[in-house]
Amino acid sequence: MAEKHVKNMTKFERLTHQEFQRGFSLIEVLVALVILVIGLIGIFNLHIVAKRGSFESFQQTQASYYANDIINRMKLNRTRLANYSGDYTGELSKPSKGCDVAVGAVSLCSPAETEAWDLYQWEQSFIGAAETVDGQNVGGLDSPTACIDIDGNTVTVAVAWRGIREGAGTTYSGNECGKDDLGTRRRIFVVSTVII
């Protein structure tokens, strides 16, 4: 029946009918491309959000490691426990005597020398001094500040760093470590323990 309808059309009607059908398939292709592009943009945005979340998670894990590292060092040097208290930003100078057997220390260190070495090594670790590119530290935390508070045998270690964007972690009022330096992008990990 459709063929009869086309045969009964005038030449002008047939031409306009065919032209309409040719343009219609082009519009379908353009609509499909727009939908595809919108989908790809969504996938790229999802990838960026996942990368940010992965980086924030890695920083949180690193902060936990560094806090527990210094606590373990303090447990091994209990006689100097009160002297570990302070705020640390990576500005300690290298002690004159290295107390790490792994780097060739052959003589025993006093508790004071061990404390100085522990704090120096710990600071170098959380600022990422072991991993550098063109003189810049690329390991460790982003703009870290660490605070150790000691009240008798109770030790509180707070490690603060700069997050990728502003977040809910900035309003934590239980510890002020890094609050002034890191502003609204501050992230903080706090652990308390008792060393007997």
Question: Where are the regions a protein language model picked out?
Answer:
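Intrinsic low-complexity/disordered segments
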Residues: R14-Q18, F44, Q59
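Glutamine-centric residue-chemistry signal
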Residues: Q21, H47, Q60-Q62
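N-terminal signal-anchor/signal peptide hydrophobic helix marking the start
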Residues: R22-V34
